[in-house]
């Protein structure tokens, strides 16, 4: 079976493990985009540490869960988002204001929407978590 979107698979498995109350989840295959997305989530405290396991194939990631994550998901297709349109996306995705993060891929790297606003850059929307 061919995987169409490895980021969507990874976020869905994190979501399911979090709902079941698991402490750890194994994600495979590993990719740079998944690692950067998890780094943004870890920076905000939604997940614990994660460890990349190199098995000389596609690699695996073991993520420690903290129980703080409510939902995470991918936005497909990766829409172009200008700085002024971020507010609309926040209203559509999140249950309330000042709550949750949109992850963007920009020319300055993968970051959350608040950092993109500080750096004054738009980009393509990857996903969200809250």
Swiss-Prot record:
Alphabetical list of SUPFAM superfamilies matching this protein = Ribosomal protein S8 (SSF56047)
Cellular localization per UniProt = Cytoplasm; Nucleus, Nucleolus
PROSITE patterns documented for this protein: RIBOSOMAL_S8
Q: Which GO terms describe its molecular function?
A: structural constituent of ribosome
Q: Which UniProt keywords apply?
A: Cytoplasm, Nucleus, Ribonucleoprotein, Ribosomal protein
- Cellular component aspect of the GO annotation: cytoplasm; nucleolus; ribosome; small-subunit processome
Pfam families in the record: Ribosomal_S8 (PF00410)
Q: Which cysteines are joined by disulfide bonds?
A: none
One GO biological-process annotation of the entry reads:
ribosomal small subunit biogenesis
Subunit and interaction comment: Component of the 40S ribosomal subunit. Part of the small subunit (SSU) processome, composed of more than 70 proteins and the RNA chaperone small nucleolar RNA (snoRNA) U3.
UniProt-recorded name of the protein? Small ribosomal subunit protein uS8
> Organism source for this protein?
Pongo abelii (Sumatran orangutan)
